[in-house]
Amino acid sequence: MQYLAAYALVALSGKTPSKAAVEAVLKAAGVAVDASRVDAVFQELEGKSFDALVAEGRAKLVGSGSAAPAAAASTAAAAAAVVAEAKKEEPEEEADDDMGFGLFD
């Protein structure tokens, strides 16, 4: 993912992505560069424009994006139920009429 992000940063800067530019971005971020991974990214993306890659990724996210909010909502509802249940389980405090503990008798 770091290698693809570095590729994207170079492309978004207006430059044509090159292996040297991607390696420079990774080194600037403190990543130990693996040349074989850089090569793999460039082999996978060969002949594809960055704009086309973004459009393709966006289309994939739209197709699967509807499930995420439902999961988050059900998680929030479950957490609220646990909190409500915990509040019910707390024992009621007994009222002490003698709060002075006999200090001023």
Curated annotation (Swiss-Prot):
GO BP term, example: cytoplasmic translational elongation
Location of region: Disordered: 84-105
Gene3D superfamilies listed in its UniProt record: 1.10.10.1410
Record flagged with keyword Nucleotide-binding: no
UniProt entry keywords in alphabetical sequence: Phosphoprotein, Ribonucleoprotein, Ribosomal protein
Pfam families documented for this protein: Ribosomal_60s
One annotated Gene Ontology cellular component of this protein: cytosolic large ribosomal subunit
MF term (GO), any: structural constituent of ribosome
Keyword Endoplasmic reticulum attached: no
Post-translational modification: Phosphorylated.
Subunit structure: P1 and P2 exist as dimers at the large ribosomal subunit.
Free-text function comment from the UniProt entry: Plays an important role in the elongation step of protein synthesis.
Similarity-based family: Belongs to the eukaryotic ribosomal protein P1/P2 family.
Name of the protein: Large ribosomal subunit protein P2
Organism for this UniProt entry: Leishmania donovani
